[in-house]
Amino acid sequence: MDRKAFNDAVNALRPAGRRVARGTTVTSGWMGNRLQDLSMWLVNLLRELPPRVGRLVLALWRGARGLVLALPQAWRAATDRSGPGLAAWLRRVPREVGIWLIVLLFRVLDLFGVPELWSFFLQMVCHVTPLTGEEIGTAAEILGPTAIRYADVRIAEGGALNFVFARNGGRAFTTFHTINLPRTGPHCRANFAILLHELVHVYQYERTGGLYVAEAIYAQNTTGYSYGGPENLQQCLATGVCYRNFNREQQAQLVQDYYERCVEEHPVAAFEPFIWDMQAGKF
């Protein structure tokens, strides 16, 4: 092969070489990010261990206490003629036991770091990015600068989530520290009010553990998102209702509505006492 032919061959291979180099860089960067995410599993497991152990012990204590008190309560229900009776008490027992088992399950899952492992798995099958500086700054103005570990929050889009959003109507949802958003539609990342709503769920997770997932799903299927608007907030304040008395979805919706009213320069006085409770972490 003469020199000219050799140079032509090299020049022809250069674009392919650049593509391989770019692909290697992207792959190594992706692997580096995933290894960093995996290392955070152990960090968060150790950091969250004391409160998670405390929540598990509390759940076990409540279960033991309920078991000890079951017989006296059954006797009282059977002998108190002014009450609903033993049959009503027996009908109530399966529901209370079921709730306790769900609480216990989530406390055990928390203890072993399952929320972090779930988030790591999700990040393997979706496009994941951290919050931007602008998103953190705006969220901090509403939630508070130290409300949550903003650096740990990830936004997941695309990938396997496309299958989920095709079936749930494109509704955003939050799994622990990962906020799952569709790329298009009213719940996409560009809608900061929705992102803020989901950040409240992250806040709930950090304060109360993974149980917030079950509580939010229950809220969606029972009392829903509506807290009654500003008029009801004034009445709630007068009767001693606090932020923690709202369900998990109402808590997030209240913060979302407060932000939107601030942006639109509408009155927010009725919201402020509840926002102060939220900023203080009173979930």
Regions found by a protein language model. Give the residues of each.
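Catalytic Zn2+-binding segment of zinc metalloproteases
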Residues: 199-217
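Short, solvent-exposed loop/turn segments at secondary-structure junctions
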Residues: 156-162, 179, 185-187, 200, ...
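Short pre-active-site segment immediately N-terminal to the catalytic Zn-binding motif
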Residues: 164-196, 240-244
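Metalloprotease/metallohydrolase-associated module, dominated by Zn2+-dependent proteases
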Residues: 41, 52-55, 62-65, 70, ...
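Conserved beta-strand->loop/alpha-helix structural units within folded catalytic cores of enzymes
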Residues: 192-205, 258, 263
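Generic structural signal for small/hydrophobic residues in well-ordered secondary structure
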Residues: 139, 177, 195-197, 201, ...
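Hydrophobic or amphipathic, alpha-helical segments that drive membrane association/targeting
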Residues: 2-164, 185
